[in-house]
Structures are given as C-alpha cells and as structure tokens.
From Swiss-Prot:
The gene is mnmG. PROSITE patterns: GIDA_1 (PS01280), GIDA_2 (PS01281). This is tRNA uridine 5-carboxymethylaminomethyl modification enzyme MnmG. It holds the Pfam family GIDA. Belongs to the MnmG family. It comes from Helicobacter pylori (strain ATCC 700392 / 26695) (Campylobacter pylori).
Length: 621
C-alpha cells in the first residue's frame, strides 16, 4: 500500500515528537512512523527534564512552539532551580517527572494534533530518486512517500543491550533494534560510528528503608518551563539521598572482569559526564563514596530510579551492589540497569538545518546525531521539523546563531566539530552565556517564534512592549546621575542601603545585590508601574552590565570579521595555528569569505581568528 504526506517522521521519541508536532502546527501534512505507539514520549532513562544547560534548551523549545516544556509542567513531581546561588547565566531549571503522565500526555497530544497521523510499524529503508529522499518502506510492506523525511531513531539503530555477559539486539530493553534501516544508512555511504549509553536500576518504593536518608525537597516557589503555564502550584514529592560505600566499591572491583565495559564486549564510547558506577569506581579509586539520588518515577511512588548508579554489571552483582547501600538493604529490583550500544551518524554529514549533505530532503535529529539527553533531542527535532516545512514552502531556512540560543550552540558544535562521544549540553559550551540566560528566553526568541507563526499575536504585542520598556528604562537609568547629596543619602538609608561616596548612575546602583524589586520601585518612581518580568530583566542587565556590553562588542567584532573576503588564490598551507584538517578543507572548498569558511565542518572560531590575522598581514605586506 502506498500512502502520501508532506513530511515523514521516523521514531516517536523526544526528537520525533517535536519534529512531527511543529511541522503539523506549521501546516504540513505529517505522518509519524513508530514501532510502538504506547512508548511515544517514554523517558527511557532518568525521570527528569531540564538541568544545567538542558533547562535552557527546554525553555527555548517552548518559546519556539515546542511541547516539552508544557508537558513537563503538567507532569512534574518536583521542581528546582539548580545553581540558584550563582549568577543567572548558569542557573538551570530541572523537574522530576511522572514518567507515566508525561508519556500519556505526549502520546495523546501527538494522536490528537490536526495534520498529523501515526502508524505502528518499523521503517526498513529509504526510497531515493536522483539523490533525493522521496519516502520509506516498512516491515509490513507499506510504502510511504513524502517530500521530506526526518529520522529520529534514538538508540534503535543496530542497538545492542548489555547486561553482564548477556547481549540482546534491542533498541531499548525488551524492544526490537532497527537493523534493516541501520544497514540501509551504512549502504548509502554515511559515516557511521558506535556510541554507548546506559541506565540505572529501579527498585520497588515499598522495599526502601527511608529512615536515616537525607530528604531532598523541591523549591518553595517552584519554577516552571512554559511561558504558557498559568496558576502553577504543583504537588511536589521528595527525593532521597544515599551513598555508595567501601563495601559497594569492593563488590564492583571484584567483578570488573565481568563488566562489559572492561571486558571488551562494549566498543562504543559512553557519555563522559554520566559514567557508569563501575567506571566511576575505576577512574576515581581514591573516593570512598559516591552520591546517589532515589527519585520517584510516578506520583504513586511505586518505583524509584537510583540516579548515579548506571551500570551494565551482571544481575547477581547488581543485587549485591544495591543491597550494600544504606536504605536499599532489602530493596526489590524491578528493573535492572543495562548499557546499550547503537549506531550514530557523524553530524558533520549535516548542514545547519539538520538536512544531510548527501541526500536532499533527509533530516536527522536526536541521538542519531551523537547527542545524549531528552532536551538535546527535542531541540534538534524541533529545528528539523521547522526547516523541513520552510524548505517545502521554498522559504529561507531557520538557523539560530551561537549568540542567540543554546540550540544554536548545540547544532553548530555538532556540524562543525562532530563528536566521538555522546554530546550533552552545558552552560560552559556557550561563549555568550550571559546573553543566553533562561530568564530572557522569550525576549531572545519571541520575534523568531512570531515570524514563524508559532506565537499568538496578542502575546507577542505584550512581549514587544515589555522589550521596549526594558530598553527605554535601561537608557534612562544610564543617564540618571546620582550624587551623594543629603536627600539621596537619606533615601538610601531609609531603604537600608549603604551610602554612595561618589557620583554614580542608576545602573551602578541597581547592580547591588541588595537592591530588590521593591527597592527599585521605591527609589526610582518611573520603575514603579513596570511588571515583574520587565523589572527582572532590568535588574539582571544592570548587575552584569559591563560583561554584557563586552559580549555584545565581541559579537559585533565577530560579525565584522565574518564579512572579510579571502583573496583569490590565498594559500592556506603553512599558516601557523591551522591544523592539517583545516588546511585540507579550506583548500578543497576555497571559501570566498570568512563567513563561508565558518560554514565548513571542522573549521573552528580559533581557525577563523588565525585566518583573519594572516589575511590582514598579507594584505599589509
């Protein structure tokens, strides 16, 4: 049977959900093919959304019309701001989720969205015509034709699950791997490598002894992800903290020879920042304990996820390890930990739109691109979906710059640098992180969302008004000069503020930590009518004014540099600081400007700085 649509999405994980929903929202006829409809939106690993860098991605996805944020707000069990004591640039919202509720909400949203149909089957191969994808075939002899195809297969491509010496061909425990599609992609000439990730055991909630464990509460004023969320007052559950101990470590050491990670059974590289417990014991042998979080998987507290205990050790060893830990002495394991090895395609095979360079109309998103994490997958799925629709409409692609969004950093890192280990987002990856805060996501991306038809006009008008008020009042504060007069000192004293000794502007005064919203309104009457969202932005911009201005200067410098032309016949060979790889690519593609050079996979900002310097030197000589 042959069926037709505008866009096909293969895979119903977090990337596939966002890709299919956003494409349908933008008016395309979308068909989602997934192995199991019941697992659409399943959180395969930890029951949480957000975190450092990841919270930024979730909020960016939300502003650009995605679903992850709003689903999390309706399924959360505990909400916290991580790094709350640090500056706003590195804070991250994180929520424990009810995995069942999240999955059901995601699945129902997909099944009830106009322009979007779903079928339960396995994609086996791509249909190509003149190096352009025109559809797929499935395991039940269905043929689907479409103008664009987005592949979001997660860990299913040639997936192998490892528990001790045992191996099974699964894309997730108990689910079939996608071997035919994996073979098809290899035959098409894509650069395919292997990665590994893992998950932690789960234990029955009623078998845990919580007495004496440290209780971990959510925030009193819980943060939320979606700007559409109203009247947020969730019921929050506690998590609990326990630790491994020397006995735990000895059990693991005694069984290193049975660990797939060390026996040579696993070849794929695992996530650097989420190592298995056996890897931690091996690498950090001097540590006497490692912290573990017991996280409820649902509101019913029937199962707890042991965060920090990712493992692929044999079943009997997992039992001994868990029973050696305080509070888990009599714990009943409901699901064992395991490692999974899978194919991914080097993301240097992609353009900034996530379309493959090799096959026109084919987009890749999520773990197939070498990333790890629900949020990274959702961000890629969203961008692939948006760009597939824009390509259908013959409109300009939507590409976010590194100074606009963490999504821009994520995609640029992937396609220019590639990866040899599972890539996850951190605030440290963003050189302009002071400009890319969670708190200003709406102001950064609202205009893009509105232009793409992904934000309501009334809300956008409010947002535009707020943005103007921020700019106007920051200008006014910079021009508002205060002297240590008797009147000014009296007013500061009334607010319990330290006096000023010299002339200062309003921005400098508001840079004080102690100058809260109430004091801002009291001291500067023109700020009194402003809403909390506007005041928050003014406060942050004042506090980090010097650093923010410096980052804007760096952006202007970079933009100016990218406009520099590369002289015809310019010799790249022999320039100190350029790697052999960079020279080979520059000689091959012969870019006409530094901007064109920046679009070449593997050419880094450091390469561009070196090129800029030598173009200048050779012009002068």
């Amino acid at each position: 049977m042959v069926k037709e649509s505008d866009i096909l999405v293969v895979g119903g994980g977090h990337a596939g959900i966002e890709a299919s929903l956003i494409a349908a929202k933008m008016g395309a006829r979308v068909h989602l093919i997934t192995m199991l409809i019941d697992t659409i939106g399943l959180a395969s690993c930890n029951p949480a959304i957000g975190g450092l860098g990841k919270g930024h991605l979730t909020k960016e996805v939300d502003v650009l019309g995605g679903a992850m944020g709003i689903i999390t707000d309706h399924s959360g069990l505990q909400y916290r701001v991580l790094n709350a004591s640090k500056g706003p640039a590195v804070r991250g919202t994180r929520a424990q989720i009810d995995m069942d509720t999240y999955r059901i909400l995601a699945r129902n949203l997909v099944l009830n969205t106009p322009n979007l149909s779903v079928s339960q089957e396995m994609t086996e191969s791509l249909i190509l015509e003149n190096d352009e994808v025109v559809g797929v075939t499935t395991n039940i002899n269905n043929t689907y034709r479409a103008k664009k195809v987005i592949i979001t297969t997660g860990t299913f491509l040639k997936g192998v699950v490892h528990i001790g010496e045992h191996q099974n061909q699964n894309g997730r425990f108990g689910e079939n791997a996608s071997n035919s599609l994996a073979l098809n992609l290899r035959e098409l000439g894509f650069k395919v490598d292997r990665l590994k990730t893992g998950t932690c055991p789960r234990v029955a909630g009623n078998s845990i002894d919580f007495e004496g464990l440290e209780e971990h509460f959510g925030d009193t004023n819980p943060p939320y992800f979606s700007y559409k969320t109203k009247d947020f007052n969730p019921t929050q559950l506690s998590c609990f903290i326990t630790y491994t101990n020397p006995i735990t470590h000895q059990i693991i050491r005694d069984n290193f020879h049975r660990a797939p990670l060390f026996s040579g059974q696993i070849e794929g590289i695992g996530p650097r920042y989420c190592p298995s417990i056996e890897d931690k014991i091996n690498r950090f042998s001097e540590k006497e304990r490692h912290q573990l979080f017991l996280e409820p998987q649902t509101i019913h507290k029937s199962e707890y996820y042991i965060n920090g205990l990712s493992t692929s050790l044999p079943l009997d060893v997992q039992e001994k390890v868990i029973h050696s830990i305080k509070g888990l002495e009599n714990a009943l394991i409901t699901r064992y930990g395991y490692a999974i090895e899978y194919d991914f395609i080097q993301p240097t095979e992609l353009t900034h739109t996530l379309e493959t360079k090799k096959i026109k109309g084919l987009y890749l998103a999520g773990q197939i691109n070498g990333t790890t994490g629900y949020e990274e997958a959702a961000a890629q799925g969203l961008m692939a979906g948006i760009n597939a629709v824009l390509a259908l409409k013959n409109q300009a692609p939507f590409i976010l710059k590194r100074n606009e969004a963490y999504i821009g950093v994520l995609i640029d890192d992937l396609i220019t640098k590639g990866t040899n280990e599972p890539y996850r987002m951190f605030t440290s990856r963003a050189e302009y992180r002071l400009l890319l805060r969670e708190d200003n996501t709406l102001f950064r991306l609202g205009e893009h969302a509105y232009r793409l038809g992904l934000m309501e006009e009334d809300f956008y008008k409010e947002l535009k008004k707020d943005k103007q008020e921020i700019q106007d009042n920051l200008k006014r504060l910079k021009e508002y000069i205060l002297t240590p007069s008797k009147e000014v000192l009296k007013r500061l004293d009334e607010l319990d503020e330290n006096p000023i000794n010299d002339k200062v502007d309003g921005v400098s005064l508001l840079a004080r930590d102690s100058f809260n919203a109430e004091k801002m309104r009291s001291f500067f009457s023109f700020l009194a009518p402003l809403n909390e969202r506007v005041l928050e932005q003014i406060k942050i911009e004042c506090k980090y004014n010097i650093y923010i201005e410096k980052q804007h200067e760096n952006i202007a410098k970079m933009d100016s540099m990218l406009k520099v032309s590369i002289p015809k016949g310019f010799v790249f060979k022999g320039i100190p600081g350029l790697s052999l790889e960079a020279v080979e690519k520059l000689e091959k593609f012969r870019p006409k400007s530094l901007f064109e050079a920046s679009e070449i996979s593997g050419i880094t900002p450091a390469n561009l700085d070196v090129l800029h310097l030598y173009i200048h030197l050779r012009k002068n000589s």
